[in-house]
């Protein structure tokens, strides 16, 4: 039984489809939005309308921006010789927040997964190979998550580009900054030992 009008129920149902928001969290979010109708709900609705009208997928790298090519691909100060390959746009944004990469990116749009039926043709791998055969890229940084599917995808890409004469590196795996050894899982500790370097 609905306890409120259909418009509000629809908003709750739509919000609950977002990652990390179930029906209960969506209900709380909607109640907060309605309480702050003028200062939050109205501006949010306007921002969503603007984003819907202006958001674009970059035809070069797969990033989300309001321009195509995106601001990163259009930035002439970026090193065009280093290409960082990520699974999703959120991974690209995380690396940008960290200020850790000064080259360009390529978003795959997921990972290879036999269980989920995701193969190479379902990802942005064909476009990646096109970019790499252009001759400008000298190094590829594989920034996949440290999951079985992430590592499978990294190995697949390495095999696909092996004859192009491009150096391939991957992100280090191991102890996070501020991490305590006693709280880390065995796999992380093993990866940290294998990835150790001189101090």
Curated annotation (Swiss-Prot):
Superkingdom of source: Bacteria
GO molecular function list: DNA binding; zinc ion binding
Organism for this UniProt entry: Parvibaculum lavamentivorans (strain DS-1 / DSM 13023 / NCIMB 13966)
Annotated protein name in UniProt: Recombination protein RecR
Protein role: May play a role in DNA repair. It seems to be involved in an RecBC-independent recombinational process of DNA repair. It may act with RecF and RecO.
Residue intervals of every C4-type zinc finger in the record: 58-73
Pfam families the UniProt entry points to: RecR_C (PF21175), RecR_HhH (PF21176), RecR_ZnF (PF02132), Toprim_4 (PF13662)
UniProt record similarity statement: Belongs to the RecR family.
InterPro entries (alphabetical): DNA_Rcmb_RecR, Rcmb_RecR, Rcmb_RecR_Znf, TOPRIM_dom, TOPRIM_RecR
Signal peptide from the UniProt entry: none
HAMAP family associated with the record: RecR
Domain Toprim: 81-176
Alphabetical UniProt keywords: DNA damage, DNA recombination, DNA repair, Metal-binding, Zinc, Zinc-finger
Entry-linked CDD domains: TOPRIM_recR (cd01025)
GO biological process: DNA recombination; DNA repair
């Amino acid at each position: 039984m609905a306890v409120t009008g259909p418009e509000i129920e629809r908003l709750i149902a739509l919000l609950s489809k977002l990652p990390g928001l179930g029906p209960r969290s969506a209900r709380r979010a909607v109640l907060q939005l309605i309480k702050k109708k003028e200062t939050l709900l109205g501006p949010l609705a306007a921002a969503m309308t603007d984003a819907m009208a202006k958001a674009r997928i970059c035809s070069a790298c797969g990033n989300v921006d309001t321009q195509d090519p995106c601001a990163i691909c259009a930035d002439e100060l970026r090193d065009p010789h280093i290409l960082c390959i990520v699974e999703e746009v959120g991974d690209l944004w995380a690396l940008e927040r960290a200020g850790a990469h000064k080259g360009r990116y390529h978003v795959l749009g997921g990972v290879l997964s036999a269980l989920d039926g995701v193969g190479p043709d379902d990802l942005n791998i064909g476009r990646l190979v096109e970019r790499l055969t252009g001759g400008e890229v000298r190094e590829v940084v594989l920034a996949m998550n440290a999951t079985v599917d992430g590592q499978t995808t990294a190995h697949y890409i390495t095999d696909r580009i092996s004859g192009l004469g491009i150096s391939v590196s991957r992100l280090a795996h191991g102890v996070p900054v501020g991490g305590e050894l006693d709280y880390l899982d065995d796999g992380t500790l093993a990866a940290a030992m294998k990835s150790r370097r001189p101090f």
